[in-house]
Amino acid sequence: KINPIIIAVDGLSASGKGTIGKIIANYLGYEYLDTGLLYRAVAFKFITSKSAISIDKAIDIAKKIRLKDLDNPALRLEDCGNLASKLAESEKLRQELIIFQRNFPNKKKGAVLDGRDIGSVIFPNAKIKFFIVADLEVRAKRRNEEYKKIGIEHTITNIEKKLKERDKRDKTRKVSPLLCVSDAI
């Protein structure tokens, strides 16, 4: 049995988790998973189907998600991110997506996962845990660059406002709030 090495990368939205996680994974030859894309994929299904949002339907969607579903650039859109953050407050949906996340490293020598609760909930025994922080202004500029790449115009002020709202929601949700665990770097 392969016992994969798990590296957890947690942090705020647009803090650089994905960039850092991908660099580490590429350097080590490990697989990489942006776990936020799982929630965004569920949100995207609701947005594109224009169906009423329910947790039962979200769980049904989550059960059908495959890795290839996470390659869609539309998952990076603001609407997907905001709805994903709200859906992530559901304990039932989180439990379903935890299954996907915990199975991801199977049959691999190692995996890097980034998100909000990788080191605290998904893999509390991860070999290495990082918690990434960046100033709000830097994060807003990073997010603005992401938006520009997909043809979306925003003001830095508006992006900062949205990031603050997202930070508050992520840090204060009852289930798996964003926090820096004591053994994170």
Residue ranges of predicted features:
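Hydrophobic anchor at the beta1->P-loop junction of P-loop NTPases
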Residues: 7-9
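Phosphate-binding P-loop
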Residues: 1-4
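Walker A (P-loop) phosphate-binding loop of P-loop NTPases
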Residues: 14
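ATP-dependent small-molecule kinase phosphotransfer cores
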Residues: 37-110, 117-120, 137-141, 145-149, ...
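Walker A/P-loop
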Residues: 18
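Short, well-ordered beta-strand core segments
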Residues: 111, 127-131, 184-185
